[in-house]
Amino acid sequence: MVALYFMMDEKLIELGLIKNLETGRCEYDSYIRNGMLMQLRRLGIGDNIGEAHMRNRAWVSHWVVEQAAKDNCIREINREGKTYYNIEDYGRVRELFGELLREVQRIKSQGDYEAAKALVEGYGVKVDPEIHKQVLSRAEALGIAPYGGFINPKLVATTDTSGAILDVTL
């Protein structure tokens, strides 16, 4: 959540880490889409979310979308039997990530187990069966795997006698 909050911070541009806030907007779009929809491809019909990372994405996304609906800064769009989430106000969504981050920090610092349980179980476990069927149908039509992965290359440094790196090969 710290990264989500800071993805829309001008300081990242100042530090040269991103060129503009479009990077943050894309990350917000991706995070909400994944937490609300895409990760459901990994579950069978009727399953609850059990994996910790999936629960985390789900409860953060569901909480933010629920709060955002109050002032229409994220709209749920249903068109031709498909559900989409459209962020209308990225600044407000950033504020919501900040509010949730503050609450999580409070929970951690006070050891408030019941509040943590309420967030995870209230927002991160149950799956809307209609949305789930929709996601599975859409994914099946695309014929793509429900998981992505990374291949980490082995990098080998060539150094001089003082240890300075001269070259790196794969």
Where in this protein do the model-derived segments appear?
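Active-site recognition of the HExxH zinc-binding catalytic motif
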Residues: 1
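Long, well-structured alpha-helical subdomains associated
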Residues: 4-107
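Non-catalytic terminal regions of proteins
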Residues: 77-170
